[in-house]
Amino acid sequence: MTHRFPRSRTALAVALMAGFAMSAQARVFRSADVHGDSFPTNMAVKFMGDELSKLTGGKDSIKVFGNSALGSEKDTVDQVRIGAIDMARVNGASFNEIVPESLIPSFPFLFRDVDHFRKAMYGPAGQKILDAFAAKGMIALTFYESGARSIYAKRPVRTPADMKGLKVRVQPSDLMVDEIRAMGGTPTPMPFAEVYTGLKTGLVDAAENNLPSYEETKHFEVAPDYSETQHAMTPEVLVFSKKIWDTLSPQEQAAIRKAAADSVPYYQKLWTAREASAQQAVTKGGANILPAAQVDRAAFVKAMQPLWTKYEKTPQMKQIVDEIEATK
């Protein structure tokens, strides 16, 4: 990601603290998340809050409200846009109907692997996507990687034929709906907090997510077959209310941006460790993981990649996709 900071972090920290020595009253920014306190996203935003406090001499800090305490992801996006809450960590798919550019990281099979994701999304292409949020009332501070999303159900999924007849929970995103339909399933939008009950009661037959989310929510108890389709690498996005942002001093804005950027390496370490522990936990809990090598990736790519053309809504979006593909 292109961060607009001086190269010397120490110099920036000193400059920021000097600016805050004579600044206004202390602020506690409220940040929303649907995950629990021990989930990497929450821990990363808390780390960001600690860094922000250091940079501002204790004047600014962040309080994280997890476990959907401030509402669903859609609810918190709406609240951020109107300034009812200061910030939120939200999965990128929740912005798809608001910020067209946010569709791009959700394109099926766009990223070759995690290394490709990091180089693209923390580079110029990713910054262009983040910049697009401002026109919609949000300052997008950074991405947090979210691993590869895969299908889980009460039976393994090896080919698109195995998806036939499955009602699959999706996020409220036209692209996500079309992805599941292209895979052969029946998409069923549903809030994240309702998925466990939906799977248990048969309201939905399957869902799709990364391993840490699968483990944290205990979805493996009611959908024990996790098939590594790895069809998308939709990132998390950390957004700040532009309405609140515009009331902040340049020093506060710079401190928030720096604290967010500094939280990324911390988050990546947490995420990598959590993926490994989640796989162990769900396997121990009775889940069956079908490895990617046993999934017909070529068949899913053939079925889903035409969606790129449908959702490249502007020449600018196509240019960003081309930049991501060209990233080495």
From Swiss-Prot:
One of its GO terms (molecular function) is carbohydrate binding. GO terms for cellular component: outer membrane-bounded periplasmic space. It is found in: Periplasm. Beta-D-galacturonate binds at residues 35, 73, 89, 149, 209, 236. Disulfide bonds: none annotated. Solute-binding protein that binds D-galacturonate and D-glucuronate (in vitro). Probably part of a tripartite ATP-independent periplasmic (TRAP) transport system that mediates solute transport into the cytoplasm. The complex is comprised of an extracytoplasmic solute-binding protein and a heteromeric permease formed by two transmembrane proteins. Belongs to the bacterial solute-binding protein 7 family. This is Solute-binding protein Bamb_6123. It comes from Burkholderia ambifaria (strain ATCC BAA-244 / DSM 16087 / CCUG 44356 / LMG 19182 / AMMD).
